[in-house]
């Protein structure tokens, strides 16, 4: 029997409420796109029963897999681990709160089919439909402006948790990604652009989900990470 064509990864950390919705919704949408998919839940040291929920699904559906960690690795490191474990030629991931409208999933996967190395949703491109508080909107636009200014990126929105990769392209890049947490999304887009990646960014409909685990300290850490990555690229040549 042929292996999966598409791997979807959902990173989770104490997100039981959102995961209870995300798993059946993911199966529903993916089943319309391909019958050759797998769903990996990258469970990052949760203590709220996420692992137990996924194990229940595993017993009923062989396409669902739990990738458990006894301790918290960080979102970026959990995604790296899941990508290495994936069986599909196309690897997607999205946030467990399903903030990005899942009707965009065929477009995300289709972009890789059509030759893109990376595809990413955007809340900031013309044509996007994003609803969030004024403070978060200002912070996001400011952050992405700084990434473009300091790191030379051409992407509108680096932090949208709705991305896909050509596995053959992305695997050799992963060892150069140093961020273990939220900056992972930005670093992978910046570094792959410097490698000449074909990136498809497209506008999405996005609504802030419940129970996001991004904290204020994460925002400050991402700001300092911009400067750290600038130093690595331009000074230490790492």
What residue ranges belong to the model's regions?
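Catalytic donor-sugar/metal-binding loop of nucleotide-sugar-dependent glycosyltransferases
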Residues: 154, 180, 189-205
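Acidic helix N-cap motif at the loop->helix transition within catalytic regions
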Residues: 17-21, 48-56
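N-proximal low-complexity "stem/linker" segments adjacent to membrane-targeting elements
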Residues: 1-28
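Cell-envelope/extracellular polymer assembly enzymes that use nucleotide-activated donors
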Residues: 5-7, 38, 187
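Conserved donor nucleotide-binding strand/loop of the catalytic core
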Residues: 37-40, 51-85
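Acceptor/aglycone-binding surface of glycosyltransferases and processive sugar-polymer synthases
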Residues: 67-85, 90, 102-182, 208-217, ...
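A conserved acidic beta->alpha catalytic loop
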Residues: 43-51, 98
């Amino acid at each position: 029997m042929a292996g999966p064509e598409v791997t979807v990864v959902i990173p989770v950390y104490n997100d039981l409420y959102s995961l209870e919705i995300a798993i059946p919704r993911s199966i529903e949408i993916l089943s319309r796109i391909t019958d050759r998919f797998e769903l990996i839940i990258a469970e990052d040291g949760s203590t709220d029963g996420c692992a137990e929920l996924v194990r229940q699904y595993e017993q009923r559906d062989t396409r669902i897999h739990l990738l458990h960690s006894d301790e918290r690795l960080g979102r970026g490191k959990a995604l790296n681990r899941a990508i290495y474990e994936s069986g599909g030629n196309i690897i997607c991931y999205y946030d467990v709160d399903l903030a990005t409208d899942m009707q965009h999933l065929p477009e995300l996967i289709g972009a890789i089919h059509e030759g893109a190395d990376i595809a990413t949703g955007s809340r900031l491109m013309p044509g996007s439909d994003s609803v969030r508080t004024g403070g978060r909107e200002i912070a996001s636009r400011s952050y992405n402006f700084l990434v473009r200014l300091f790191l030379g990126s051409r992407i509108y929105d680096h932090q949208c948790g709705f991305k896909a990769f050509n596995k053959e392209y992305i695997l050799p890049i992963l060892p150069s990604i140093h961020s273990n947490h939220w900056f992972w999304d930005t670093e992978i887009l910046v570094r792959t652009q410097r490698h000449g990646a074909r990136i498809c960014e497209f506008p999405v409909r996005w609504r802030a989900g419940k129970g996001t685990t991004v904290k204020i300290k994460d925002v400050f850490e991402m700001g300092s990470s911009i400067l750290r990555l600038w130093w690595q690229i331009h000074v230490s040549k790492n």
